[in-house]
Amino acid sequence: MPHPALPWLIDVQGRTLAYDLYDIETWRRFGWSVFDPRVADRAAARHGGGETGRSYVAMLREYLAKHLRHGRRFIESLAVPAPGAEPPLMVFGGDCELTLARIVVEAIDGRFVGRERVEDIARPVPGVDYEASMFEPGDLVVTRASLLGRRTLNVSAPRAEIEALRIANSVFLCEEHRHLTGNPSFQDNLLHALLSVDPV
């Protein structure tokens, strides 16, 4: 999931929407996940219906809220410098695949629907480059900017305070996320870094 300070949601006009992904109220407002009435009704029915089913859905919603809070704290903790000497950080990733960085939300029949693929946008606005707005180079799971702990693809842009992740070395391959560890170049670079007596 993206850093809480990064834009992750756009409308069909291509404009950034300022909603907090880690705030349970965002999920409630858009009717996503266990806040989608169809999902909630199905979950309640599968768990006894009535008061028992409603209690189960309430528990799922609290579970989601708890994990969103934990996710926010985890991501924010990465920006806090560790006391003392930190080991050098080396990151590996792919950057040859267009990777989802932002989703488009559109209102369909009174519901807010999140779109992760350009072809799923029901009412695209002419002139909006959805591919450029939604996708960035990555490995189909993690964008290059995210792996580097950056808010932008522009590596010459000065780092903001939220970009405190200090990386000693980065290696990018033309590989999908799920195949990275099987890539011979990945293995070679990792072994070199782990076994080298020289600092990274």
What kind of feature is each model-predicted range?
Residues 1-200:
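Helical cap/lid subdomain of alpha/beta-hydrolase-fold lipid enzymes
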